Amino acid sequence: MCSSDLVLREAKVLGFSDFQIARFVLSPEGNMEKENLMVRARRKELGILPAVKRINTVASEHPELTNYLYMTYAVQGYDVNYYKNEKSVVVLGSGAYRIGSSVEFDWCSVNAIQTARKLGYKSIMINYNPETVSTDYDMCDRLYFDELSFERVLDVIDLEQPRGVIVSVGGQIPNNLEIGRAHV
């Protein structure tokens, strides 16, 4: 592994996104979409992948298996088995509440999750807002309590390999990610 590959690995451990790495290393004025995907491809080629860990909601007082998950590059190993060969769907939540994006999008996300479950799908939510109903522990089969970013959503898709991704119910943030174009 060359020194630039080691720097890439260390940058991921330190919390830099593929987008930030592309912007600082490749070109601040270049084609950011293309360069972001180049960094992603190189990272995956080197096996630099996020680990999925459970959020410990009981301060280690006793063993607890929650469906609250997060991704990190700081450790290795996985706390879950992925739904790769199962019927599953990812729903992108609304993120933070703000003017123009509020509880109505959370209501849509919750309804999408409930409908998916009624149809026999394992439900996977990606959302980082603890004030939403969609992040309640019993609302979905898995909750990735993580950022709604292009990189993070693609990481979940790569690991879980869902049958589909519902983008349209979460409001502007998920709609702006253009996830569909990345997998064409």
Name each model-derived stretch:
Residues 29-36, 41-181:
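ATP-binding N-terminal substructure of ATP-dependent carboxylate-amine bond-forming enzymes
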Residues 7-9:
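Short, recurring structural edge motifs at helix starts
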Residues 19-20, 51:
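Residue-level signal for secondary-structure boundary elements
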